[in-house]
Amino acid sequence: MWQQRLGTASAFCRAVVSNGYLTEAQMQHAAQRYRLGVSRDGGVIFWQIDTTGSILDGKIMYYRPDCHRDHKRHPQWVSNRLKHYYLGDDVELIASIPSYHCLFGTHLLMEDARCKMADVFSQTSSFRLHTSDVAVVEAEKTAVILSEHYPAYLWLAAGGLFELTADKLFPLRHHRIVLFPDTDPNLTAYTRWYEVAREARRLYGCNITVSPLLELSATPEQKQRKIDLVDYLFKK
């Protein structure tokens, strides 16, 4: 069903490098951190791994050579492929088996905490644990690329406008969180994520803000195209 759990052989990884978003070395580093996989048909697998290291699911996506999504090929969940592989076409049985998801990159929270804890014990003059700030974007592609350009943040991705929910922000509650929604002409994404942020703040006391960067800086034409942070920063 897929060749390996980790790798840079997907069309996505090749496109990221060939279009100048990352160097080969940066792509290798990002692929290892995010544990990118590759399917047998060349799709990239964005594994969703929680803070315990458990793989909850994986999203298989397809990209064109210009590093934009191949809209002729719909994203697929690994869990759905497995269900159909083992259960055939039993629609009712497949529908009865739940799937669980988290933000793409959630496992980085645990790795960050371990690194910071090591720093604490290596410096006898300081015993305070400082966690990294977390940036949440919509697309996995955006998180992967910006993680190499702005490493001061831990970059996580919701995987879609409506995939961001307050409960998925619970593991982030001890971090400062900045949400970077995509832009659009009607403030739909910003408004939606603002409401999610408010709910997370109410439920978990999250230190969370929604960045207005794209709403304040994007041109009307860019908003019409519904650009994201990578589109704006690279202006390709």
Regions found by a protein language model. Name each.
Residues W2, H29-Y34, Y63, H74, ...:
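Aromatic side chains
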Residues Q4, R14, L36, L93, ...:
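Hydrophobic transmembrane signal anchors and adjacent membrane-proximal interface regions, especially
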Residues R5, G20, P75, L93-S96, ...:
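Intrinsic-disorder-associated interaction segments
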Residues I45-R173:
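Phosphate-handling DNA/RNA-contact segment within nucleic-acid enzymes
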